[in-house]
């Protein structure tokens, strides 16, 4: 499989497949394809279906198979970027649960539960995430622009939870309480931040869709407004 990223701030990834090659996606993100691509739907087994239902994900995956040389394009659902990730055997990448776009079928997608329960209960989106393992190329949706850092052993980055796109498996995630009652009540940044600790790469996004939705709420007409 070869691929090309197109579209700027409204991106698509166009994948060229050889005969018999397959791509998988969870969210119906296919935007166009050649007529010799065949789609099938799989639940991935009862255990995987249960874990996906628990995490709020779709319980089914769409698998696209090329019969002869074929082409298929996957589009992002929000303005931003598409991040290609090459997954090597023994390597893991953890993503926010809505970030996965598509992958080669050699990439295994599973639910990742953070070991520290407070990360999810107090940190918001970070408790249930997605784990990519196996071997192959995967693509992740980025809300807004992408910023990448490589953390050394013990090096930390404090991030608003919604701005965390993902990180390598060697990076640990925790929460940090914002200090000071005045900061909590008047700072407008919430009560908790996410702390990522190296070693490994982390990927951050500049405009999480949750933040955009919150910013638009005051401008949405209600029954009491003219």
What do these predicted ranges mean?
Residues 1-226:
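Composition-driven recognition of glycine/serine/threonine/acidic- and proline-rich low-complexity segments
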């Amino acid at each position: 499989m070869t691929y090309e990223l197109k579209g700027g701030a409204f991106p698509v990834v166009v994948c060229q497949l050889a005969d018999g090659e397959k791509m998988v996606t969870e969210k119906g993100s296919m935007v166009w394809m050649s007529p010799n691509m065949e789609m099938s739907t799989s639940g991935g087994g009862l255990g995987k279906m249960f874990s996906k239902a628990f995490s709020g994900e779709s319980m089914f995956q769409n698998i696209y198979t090329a019969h002869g040389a074929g082409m298929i394009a996957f589009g992002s659902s929000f303005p931003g970027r598409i991040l290609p990730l090459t997954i090597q055997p023994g390597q893991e990448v953890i993503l926010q649960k809505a970030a996965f776009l598509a992958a080669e079928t050699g990439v295994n997608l599973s639910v990742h539960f953070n070991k520290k329960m407070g990360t999810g209960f107090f940190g918001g989106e970070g408790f249930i995430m997605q784990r990519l393992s196996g071997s192959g190329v995967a693509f992740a949706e980025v809300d807004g622009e992408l910023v990448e850092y490589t953390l050394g052993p013990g090096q930390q980055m404090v991030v608003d939870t919604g701005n965390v796109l993902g990180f390598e498996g060697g990076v640990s995630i925790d929460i940090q309480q914002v200090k000071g009652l005045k900061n909590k009540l008047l700072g407008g940044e919430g009560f908790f931040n996410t702390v990522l600790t190296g070693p490994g790469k982390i990927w951050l996004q500049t405009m999480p869709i949750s933040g955009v939705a919150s910013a638009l709420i005051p401008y949405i007409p209600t029954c009491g407004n003219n």
